[in-house]
């Protein structure tokens, strides 16, 4: 197969997603498992989104709206961004891939912080690009070091704010200085998958920053706050030119009918999003206090997930927790072998996590 395989993917391994509950229970013959591994919404999907799905089941024999007009119109009105500066994706993951495919040629350079979302590097390497990874400083992205890594061959910079897996954020002033110093011919991808969870008012959203760099691309998702991870729907904001080039290679029906309808409805469900944010903040307080009582170190977060340092190592704790029916995330693949990552669950899920963690550590 090597002769047929693209050089860029020869050494890649598949993305390691969080283990599904069904898979764990099938493999281990257990019931009543919980999953705190994939930063999902513990409340499930927005009720208004569920109703919108039901209302659109009778048109599934028709192709989706390839332009995404109604969802893009809702986003345009909500965020005051022109329609032709918005693009929809099959999750924001597809928009990451479209960015790389549209703007990266073999041998071009890309810069990211590290550790960060694993998909950036996979997409870049698959396209034959070269990735420069800048180590985090005290679990935060150091934008000055990111700038130092930029070369004349750099085409794209990936910034994850808040950063996954650390949950740390970049402040408004940091981002403004950074965007001012990035060359105008370098695309800055600002991945804001978790921005809706941020409570720190010193953090600027990508919408505030769009006018501060000509090639800023802001990516968001309906998977986290809105609870629509299973539908795969995301969106991006940028100036007209990058959006135009991405649309040239975008699949014509990349956002399916049910995903568009559900996302459109979810944007109206402020009661659901407020409830989600309250559960996350209450859950973080409980989890922080419990971990303090256990004398375990953790990295405070601005998101719905955070890192916990475990003396036995992340992989060992992950495996022990699996046997107890609790799915978490080992951070080995992120280069943080002493850490696990969990997302906030419902109160009873958080309590079960703490109880199980105490058990496997004893």
Task: Name every feature range the model reports, one short phrase each.
Residues 320-324, 328-329, 333-362:
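PLP-dependent enzyme catalytic core of the Aspartate aminotransferase-like
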